[in-house]
């Protein structure tokens, strides 16, 4: 048995899980929230439903990593740090340089830092944590698991933009996608639940959280995905606009007398469900107010509309669909949302079982027995996918 630590780091959070492998048992999990502030919060769940929480100053990433390893020992989760035999790190941007997860060496770490211009909010922090854990756990393999590597199988027809090709060749201007680790996990897990090889299925996975994306999977590989050069592209999201005419972006920047970075910030943080509803980016708030606020109802309708359009285009791309999978916050918990989406996909043979669909975040098949398309809820587990890759590669 081996203990593998999975790290999912953001600029102000550090999510972690410790697995016993290969049994895939969760030994402990938790997070450090509000990093960089005076009231950072460390939480852990471990053992027989034991919970631990503390508030203290965690002002640097070094402090966060050190605190995590210290608490693992002090709480008795591990007796010695050398019990940890591998660490896996989520890395958002792998560009074209990384078509698979890999054990990190200095050259690879430099490349991850170089790719920061493609994922400026994530790569620098995630690369830094790799460096920190390498120092704190000397000799322990550090494995980077890239969000983008699942999309290395996309054909040029699906990843290239219709712009002068010198921009792709010189600057790497192309679709990279995101949420790849989540889509990869739920696709494989759905195939396991159905008892059918993934390679024999035409599957569409819907990662519907505050950030949302859709991926088409055929012959066991991703063939297209809704997010693009950045996670701003694709369907309407919590605060992101999704697809938009770029001329409108320039037009609005001029009218508002703001810079292009300021305009992009609006599209990333003030648009989507929040922008349309003028209330909230949270699907639950919109569902609660839809009956009395037309803008809330409109935001929900637009979201469903965009999802259905992408699913329809992917069905055409793959010349059919066998399986539809819902995951992430709204996808796992939103029974009404799932019903609204599937109702508009009835033309493809999608039919829900109303009773089976009335669940929250529970792994199950929710399609009717006579549905031509299998519909499932599969709660995502990026950390487990990371741990599996560590075991495969270290």
Swiss-Prot record:
One of its GO terms (biological process) is acetyl-CoA biosynthetic process. Its EC number is 2.7.2.1. Pathway: Metabolic intermediate biosynthesis; acetyl-CoA biosynthesis; acetyl-CoA from acetate: step 1/2. Transmembrane segments: none annotated. One of its GO terms (molecular function) is acetate kinase activity. Substrate binds at residue 90. CDD domains: ASKHA_NBD_AcK_PK. Mg(2+). Can also accept Mn(2+). Keywords: ATP-binding, Cytoplasm, Kinase, Magnesium, Metal-binding, Nucleotide-binding, Transferase. It holds the Pfam family Acetate_kinase. It catalyses: acetate + ATP = acetyl phosphate + ADP. Its cofactor is Mg(2+); Mn(2+). The record marks 179, 240 as: Transition state stabilizer. It is an enzyme of class 2 (transferase). ATP binds at residues 15, 207-211, 282-284. Mg(2+) binds at residues 8, 382. Its main location: cytoplasm. The active site is at 147 (proton donor/acceptor). Homodimer. Belongs to the acetokinase family. This is Acetate kinase 1. It comes from Latilactobacillus sakei subsp. sakei (strain 23K) (Lactobacillus sakei subsp. sakei).
